[in-house]
Amino acid sequence: MTPLAVIPFRPLNPKSRLSGIMTREERELFAAAMLTDVIGAVTAAGCTPLVLATTPYTVASVRVRVTDADLSTALNTLLRDQDGPVLIMMADIPLATKEAITAVISADADVAIVPGRGGGTNAIYLQQGSSFATDYYGQSFMKHCRIAEERNLSLEVIDSFRLYVDIDEEEDLVDLLIHGTGESAALLRSFGFQPISMKGRVSVIRSSP
């Protein structure tokens, strides 16, 4: 059965922690470009994408479901009706590739989790969507592992650089500029962002495009 790939997305005023280096319009364009990269990767891996948007939004050839509920409530409402496989994939993981996602949806466990930075959860794959309930924010990775255990579901943790890198802070742009080949990396470069070595570390600077 073809996995359903649910991608939560905030179209308006996203990525507020980047507001020091991007205007609101730029952040909205950037978030949309990252979403495009994620949709492309999950589609290439054989999943059917579904965008779970916080406000009305249109994506060509992709179904969009609008909800004003918080993230976990919105996801759990959807999961209750899903007896088939479901991939929950955050929209700010623009380094995602067909190969990285295929590795996740090929897991034999009931639940496969890709951890994110700082204890977060970047992706969850469920053999049966209705078997699970999400609990995002805070230490969501540990909470999701505990939920799998409490429900007697087998669990596999997927170690994936491509799916580990999520974009929230200015320093996160470094990995995207170095490793990214999709629309979001191209957009960043068109904005004038580029990596630079400073005091032995790589940072980003912005020049006039």
Swiss-Prot record:
Pfam families cross-referenced by the UniProt entry: CofC
InterPro entries, alphabetized: CofC, Nucleotide-diphossugar_trans
EC class of the enzyme, as a word: transferase
Keyword GTP-binding set for record: yes
Listed EC numbers: 2.7.7.68
Keyword line: GTP-binding, Nucleotide-binding, Nucleotidyltransferase, Transferase
An example Gene Ontology biological process: F420-0 metabolic process
This protein's pathway: Cofactor biosynthesis; coenzyme F420 biosynthesis
Disulfide bonding pattern of the chain: none
Reactions catalysed according to its record: (2S)-2-phospholactate + GTP + H(+) = (2S)-lactyl-2-diphospho-5'-guanosine + diphosphate
GO MF, any single term: phospholactate guanylyltransferase activity
Keyword GTP-binding: yes
Quaternary data: Homodimer.
Role this protein plays: Guanylyltransferase that catalyzes the activation of (2S)-2-phospholactate (2-PL) as (2S)-lactyl-2-diphospho-5'-guanosine, via the condensation of 2-PL with GTP. It is involved in the biosynthesis of coenzyme F420, a hydride carrier cofactor.
Family the entry assigns: Belongs to the CofC family.
HAMAP family, alphabetized: CofC (MF_02114)
Protein name: 2-phospho-L-lactate guanylyltransferase
Species assigned in the record: Methanosphaerula palustris (strain ATCC BAA-1556 / DSM 19958 / E1-9c)
